[in-house]
Amino acid sequence: MTAPVRPVPTVRVYRFELVKLFATWRIRLLVLACWLAPAVFVAAVSRQSSLPVDTLFGRWMNATGWAGPLVMLGFAGTYALPLLTSVVAGDVFAAEDRLGTWRHLLVAVRSAPRIFAAKALASLTVLLLLVAGMAVSSTAGGLLAAGNRALAGFDGHLLTPGDAAAKVLLAWVSVLAPTLALAAIGLLGSVLGGRSPTGLLLPAVVALAMALAQLLPLPVAVRLALPSYAFVAWNGLFTDPVQLGPLLIGVGVGLAWALAATALAYLLFVRRDFTNAAHDGSRRRTLVVLPLVALFAATAGIIAAATPALGSGIGQDKVQQSVATAFAHLYRLQAGQLHRPDVTEAQLAATAACTKGDGLVEAEGPGNDWRCVVSWHLPGVAATGSAVYQLDVTSDGRYVADGDGPKEVNGYFQVRTPDGDQPNPLWQFDANVELLPTTKG
């Protein structure tokens, strides 16, 4: 009797697909770029006098090496990761259509599900290698250029180098969820598109659309239901207390999209008629989008029901609390740099009174017309200190506070520190408003 023909083990097919991916010049070039370019970029920028202050943690790049990988993370979430998922995952199935090698592959492997699993795992492996390269390289460049020093958090409190290292690692790990979502969308586009470049374009187009949506004043539930939200929610790791709620929701939504899009791609792939040489993707491409639309609607509904957040999530009380907290932390940092007596946040008892549009409009929502007056007390001093800030609040809750006097407190001047001259930390600072309701302790 003839022994039954068994499919090739998935591990062998996975190794074969991995070799095929690394055989292409573009993957080799991407690996080289991701492991070298971030270190060069971060090291070069950290030594400049003009820093990327419009980027989160950019103003701290020459003060600590832990700011560099966070600046790179912000760039990666906006530009690099969508493009990498397009190149790696968006073409893994379509390449076989262009080369006309599906029949040969099926004869060799004898299992469409194993081919799908191997290709998906090979793409995932390459993506993880690229993300790890950017994280390790940017961290190395930052530490070599600026040193292993304390990092000012997103609310101004100082993190020890050890705490900063742990949170930088967690931040990079957290963005794997939206990266997997984009990769799964790339797999789906590659299966759907056949010979067309749909798979290559789809992750980048979806990421661009979601990035544009994040700029709009969306309701909180809709914003958190976007699979790309974890690309910006990681900044909550650098506040005290940590803003875990939005980050966990963002990671969960990203993983849900990754599973849904991968399942759709798998079902379409295993049901494909490979005997039809004229087949060029699914004929029901529009209908395939419906499950993802339903997932988005269901996620937004669940978040809206589970959280009492209304509107944009940016309100007067939240802005005032955030500004007062950040000011108190940074005041202590400034006092230490100027060799003044240390005071605690409790002793300062900083408060903020904020208005929007000179008080002519309701104090809620994003905008660059926020104005805050911060007041504080020093032990043994009868007079109450005050300082004015102009705020530019974006739709995702992040804001830049620009000091508007008195110049002795929040004006621009250089402070001489053991690590070199640094701008007055109270002059300009970045912070954020947590969009979900918070419990005051």
Predicted features and spans:
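Transmembrane helix segments
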Residues: V40-S50, S196-Y229
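Cytosolic-side transmembrane helix boundary signature
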Residues: A261-V289
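Transmembrane helix boundary and interhelical loop/hinge segments in multi-pass membrane proteins
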Residues: S86-H104
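Secretory targeting signals
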Residues: T2-P4, W35-V87, A117-L187, V191, ...
